[in-house]
């Protein structure tokens, strides 16, 4: 773990998280990005409101990305100091620039996460840990929760907002299983194309699901792991919301990916389909898009707890 001045360090060329957060999630469209940021702000506000520690003075923003959560917390609590921690140097650079623009840089520290994770931070360093869409991508979640417990002083608290992708992966597995016994007709052909798209975004076998750190857990697992780590006063909410895609047009919809390890629909159409298959799949999906029949479903788990 290194404390860095992100502006003075050369970022590596290969940075999938920065590429996704800054470009791919909104397909490079500013209108789409504004809509996404507005939705993310809602997730952040709910996580902040659920924090049991009402007036924290030291906070760890784990997996801070571009700093959206920590900056919101600094705005909410004028005496707060925040450590922004992320493996991506480019995203730390973006968070640092945003903190400077907001006039709160003096209350910030930026830490690049390395192979040792949080091991180098001393015990009881913080009275709050917050994270959004970061724990989901950590392979050893129980260990990380135990680390957060160590980093908090007595009475310290955590508040998490994490996406739950397990249902999408289970659906992909079920779709694959159904296709193994499907007849060779037009309906099965179309289902195979839809499955091809889904399988490039979520694991579609039981083994792949078990090995996928961002899909192989549920909100109940988060609750159980936090309890095992020694946290008390646990509260869990699962929000499931459906609605139209935030993408402003068909092209941006095809170029969006739900997470950094997924391929976009456009990639699948262009690189994984033959000409006839591409015409069939894109024709069906575009018609559904234009009719407003494509619905986005988001599952977000909010977990808060306190260190006794």
Show which residues each predicted segment covers.
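C-terminal helical/coil "lid" or tail adjacent to the Rossmann-like core of SAM-dependent
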Residues: 8-35, 235-291
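Class I SAM-dependent methyltransferase SAM/SAH-binding core
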Residues: 58-62, 66-118
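A short acidic, Gly/Pro-enriched loop at the edge of an enzyme's catalytic core
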Residues: 119-128
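A short SAM/SAH-binding and catalytic strip from SAM-dependent methyltransferases
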Residues: 127-140, 164
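A short glycine-rich, Lys/Arg-flanked "PGG" loop and its adjoining helix->strand segment in the class I
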Residues: 142-154
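Short alpha-helix
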Residues: 214-229
